[in-house]
Amino acid sequence: MGIAILSAPVLRAGDSVPGGGRTAAEIVTEAPVSLVGKSDSPAFREERMPGCPVSLVGKSDSPAVGENDSPAFREERIPGCPVSHVGENDLPAVGEIDSPAVGEGDTLTLRDVIVSSTFSKVSRSPLRLATIDSETLRERAAARTYPELLKGIPSLYATSESGSYGDAKLNIRGFGQENISVLLNGIPISGLVTGSMYWNNWMGLADATYAVQVQKGVGASLLSDGSVGGSVNILTDSPSETFTAEAGFYGSDYGTMKGYVKVASGALPKGWSMNMMLSHVRGSGYVDATSVNSYAYMLSVSKRFGEEHSIIFTALGSPEKHEQRSSRLSFAEVSEYGLSYNKNWGYRDGKVFNLSLNNYFKPYFTLQHIWSGEKVSMKNSVYVAFASGGGRWSETKGKPLSSYTADGLIDWTSAIASNRNPDGSAANILSQYTAGHTHAGVISTLEYVLGRGFKVGAGLHGQIYNTWEEETIDDLLGADFWIEDYEGKSLAGLAGRDPVKHVGDKVRTENGKNTSHGTAYLSLSYESERLSFDLGASLFGSRTRRWDLYNYVGDDVWSDAAAGTGASIKGGALFKAGKGHSVYASAGWYSRLPYSSVWFSSGNNEITRDVTNERNMLGEIGWRHSWASGNFELTGYSAYWKNKSLMSSKYKQIDSEDSRYMVTGLDALHLGVELSFFQRLGRWLEAEAFASVGDWKWKNDVNAIIYDDYSGVAVGKVDVYCDGLPVGDAPQTQIGANLKALLPKGFAVRASWQFNDRMYADFDPLTRTDPEDRTPSYRLPSYHLLGADASWTGNFGKFSLTVFVQGNNLLGTSFIERGKDGSSHDSDTFTGFWGFGRNADFGARISF
């Protein structure tokens, strides 16, 4: 969609504008700056006065003077006439993204440039946008993942997935993570293997985040191929003009604690500046036996070269270790053991010992060059990530470890006592299933101003994504050795390999994929006072080879290359009808390549030959209206998803009842409407509400290939009857409201309510092989969630102190976040993950 320009600097009443000598008060009504923010949920912190002509709305290319370094937008007011953020040419926004303004005679700051090249602007965007700023992120960041920070946006469903810290899942408009693009500072970071996003790789980095923008539907980026439900763009802290420092502590009533410190150097001599953040999370989780120990860091160093060129180096990462709850629960188990129940652990030698333990570290480095000329702007990026980690796993040749239970927990004593067979071999082992990847790429984008409101853009993105995974024995559980069944589990058979394995030896898995992917795009955009539009097209291609040292030996370890090409066209337009009204529409068509895991769905080197590109057709229309004290937005959308390939997870514990399968040729239609509303109720009270209603259904019957769990040999093919069934895994009806009071003396209180309904369980294709069974998946009970928080901020010279407390699920509602349908499509055979009961967070931060 091209590069959108965003700025929100501050104008002081007495400041003069470069080049004209006029004051800010004189020019603000003529060419005022614009704001970008969360159009789904706007909120402001200034006072408003009816009849005042001053408005901070309009063209985005206005000169900027003054300064604004506060985390949320707080403008200087012209005496006797408080400013307003509403009017004919813009829409008020929440979580305003403020850019430090510059002094007289200077140009925009580097932060302005970074934000401008990364985010879309709500005043001219034909997309449904939601932007959350750093202040709002800090209010919500206690012990939460990135997706959970986005709660409260219509048609967006974010949960902690299983209840383990850092394990999160995100749906937008009914589409799962593999159909949501995630970008970090404008660079796509979603995996090329499955499209999945492992949010625990980025734990702790919320404290180094400047803003997060959600773009629903087609999204603005032409360098990201996966945006069907939408895209999430994370912007980390970037250079500012003044020195700031901050430290904070968060805690929860169930034992998770986090501390962090961050420093921004401000402008240093010769154009240098630096940002740094360190954080540490540790403690117990809400779910039993789910402790966490995680660190995070971020370092950003920038250098300006004259007025037009800048270079930014960023290094970030989050080495972490956390215990997990990997097994879904039944209604009976939750009724007996409670919401925090986890059946993956027990006591071993008197200590808590969890069957599922995850650890991962993904250091990530970027080097970006930004050129901001009068007519030409260019951004070049080089990035590389080295990821490695895994978790505790298990293998069995008899009774699974989770079957040794006592009072709902794993009886490790009995399991170990029974584990040694008469010949000394092990019936069960604990292993380390490790995986990693190297992800590197180069991006170059160019934009040229043609004049008369027109711009053209072009971009290239080349990347490699090389993965590996292996499993090694970690614990024989009292036995002497393990017999690896090469003859039954490996396509190569024994092949001269020793089947007797000890601690440290590899078993079951040793493979990887090497993928290269390229994207090129062209774009055209136009902007006038009332009309703006964007049009773009992209081409992309991918090539993947797989290697496997377990199923193959000698010269056969490499597969043939699986390759393909795809394309996309997307565009949109917005018309400002006057008196605060805007209407917009956008549409997109994708011919999207299969992910590399789909090409090799068998789990061996055989290429799945009948896989073709997905076809996605997206469209939406919307209406925005703003007035002196509020606004609302109404959007309708449609997404026709054709020829989808659906795969089960290959990461499956041996006692799991899930099948290993791949479905091809699946179609779905997602329709929906979204409404958001904001109203300021006087000087100190503001209210907002939202609602979304979807109609998401599968549209055809298909077939599924069933694979052997280890060798990947196809063992069967079954018909799957799902035409007309609701799409599951996210609520199709959401309603919510917030009420916030900004009280004297620095106090603030907020109450929030959300209602989720019409959520259906996900289903296994093997439970849908009866043509007479058209019963929808189990419909999860609807539920209400009520939360509240309070904070106090005091200023002490150059220091400010904020103390807060948050109450979550105040009514103690028992609700289900995710789940899998069973054979009877009711609560008797349903299994899933329940959400947290009543809990609280608290914390404090001090800023300089």
State where each predicted segment sits:
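C-terminal beta-signal and adjacent terminal beta-strands/loops
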Residues: 97, 637, 687, 755-766, ...
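Short strand-turn segments of transmembrane beta-barrel domains in outer membranes
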Residues: 218-221, 231-266, 278-288, 752
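Membrane-embedded beta-barrel scaffold of Gram-negative outer-membrane proteins
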Residues: 377-383, 576, 582-588, 612-671, ...
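Short acidic/polar hinge/loop motifs at secondary-structure boundaries
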Residues: 169, 188-216, 235, 340
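Short, acidic, small-residue-rich periplasmic hinge/interaction motif at the N-terminus
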Residues: 17-44, 51-52, 58, 80-83, ...
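Extracytoplasmic beta-strand/coil segments of soluble accessory domains associated
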Residues: 118-121, 126, 147-188, 204, ...
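Gram-negative outer-membrane beta-barrel transporters
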Residues: 527-530, 638-640, 661-766, 845
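Structural signature of Gram-negative outer-membrane beta-barrels, strongest in the C-terminal barrel
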Residues: 437-439, 449-455, 461-463, 478-480, ...
